[in-house]
C-alpha cells in the first residue's frame, strides 16, 4: 500500500468512527426523549430530570430540537415551574406549524398558550389555546381537549368574560 492509500484508509476510518458517534448520540437522544415522554404524566419530575440530562448540542436535527422543546416545556409545566420564556417553546412552534401530527400541533399550541399566559399575555394565550383546540378533535385527545377547554374558560374568567368562560366550561 502506498502512503496515499494509507492516509486515505486512515481518513476513512476517522470519518466512519465520527459518523458512528453522531449516530449513537442521536439514537441516545431519541431514547431519552421517548423515556421522558413515557413518564411525563406519571412522574413529571423524572421526565424533567431526563430532559435536563440531554446534551442540547446533540439535538442536531430540527425535529429533535422541536421534540425536545415541546417535552421540556411540558415538563416545566407539569412540575409547576411557570416559564415565561418563549425561547423554550419556539423551536417546537416553528417546526410543528408546518409539520407533525395533529397531536404534536395541539400540544405545541397549548403549551405556547401556557407560556404566553404565564407571561401575562392573555390575548395571545387565548389565540394559541383556540388554535390548539382546532387540532384536538381526534378521539385519542379527550384529556387534552378537556384541558384546553378548561384553560380557555379560566382565561376568559380572569378577563371577567363570564359568558365565554361558561361556554368553554360546558365543553369539559
Residue ranges and their predicted role:
Residues 1-9:
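Bacterial N-terminal signal peptides that target proteins for export
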Residues 3, 13-14, 139:
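Exposed boundary/loop context
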Residues 9-19:
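Bacterial N-terminal signal peptides
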Residues 21-172:
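A "functional boundary" signal
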Amino acid at each position: 500500500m502506498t502512503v496515499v492509500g494509507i492516509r486515505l484508509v486512515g481518513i476513512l476510518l476517522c470519518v466512519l468512527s465520527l459518523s458512528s458517534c453522531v449516530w449513537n448520540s442521536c439514537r441516545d437522544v431519541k431514547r431519552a426523549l421517548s423515556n421522558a415522554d413515557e413518564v411525563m404524566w406519571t412522574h413529571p419530575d423524572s421526565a424533567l430530570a431526563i430532559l435536563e440530562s440531554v446534551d442540547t448540542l446533540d439535538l442536531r436535527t430540527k425535529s429533535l430540537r422541536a421534540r425536545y422543546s415541546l417535552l421540556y416545556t411540558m415538563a416545566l409545566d407539569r412540575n409547576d415551574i411557570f416559564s415565561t420564556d418563549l425561547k423554550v417553546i419556539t423551536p417546537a412552534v416553528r417546526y410543528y406549524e408546518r409539520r407533525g401530527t395533529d397531536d404534536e400541533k395541539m400540544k405545541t399550541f397549548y403549551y405556547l398558550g401556557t407560556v404566553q399566559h404565564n407571561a401575562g399575555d392573555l390575548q395571545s394565550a387565548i389565540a394559541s389555546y383556540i388554535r390548539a383546540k382546532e387540532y384536538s378533535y381526534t378521539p385519542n385527545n379527550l384529556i387534552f381537549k378537556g384541558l384546553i377547554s378548561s384553560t380557555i374558560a379560566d382565561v376568559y374568567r380572569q378577563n371577567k368574560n363570564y359568558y365565554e368562560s361558561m361556554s368553554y366550561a360546558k365543553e369539559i
